[in-house]
Amino acid sequence: MWIDKQKTINLQLEMPVRLSTYRKGNAIPPLPGTNIFHSTELFHVFEMTRGYEPLLIVAYIGNRPVGKLLAVIRKSVRLFPPAIIKRCEIYGTGEYFDEEQNKEDLFGEILEHLTNEVLCKSFLIEFRNLENPLFGYKAFRKKQLFRH
């Protein structure tokens, strides 16, 4: 098992992860995957919905997509203060395509990128419907997104 981890680390060092953020549906290239919560189709639905601003973060190694995460910045308008709140919502922890890569490390890279992209626009970042609550624990702790 240790050899596999070392091999994964070496692969990541040889081939750096490139992260791309897509904000317009017509700019998104064809991507693999079957998870509806991180699909291009849901991106288009959010894009056409008033008050929703979707962004799709795709991780590439070379020109090959290895993971993706769909987030949406949702604007809530209320009668009482604070009247307008923007929050970033993500369903699940993304979708990953390369079994050779450590998914939690890849998620950590995507989470770092997501945080830098949305914190200036939204009040909070909320992850919902986590399939495995322990997945990404290290990345969430590192970003201080929750504490004991």
Regions found by a protein language model. Name each.
Residues 1-148:
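N-acyltransferase acceptor-side catalytic subdomain
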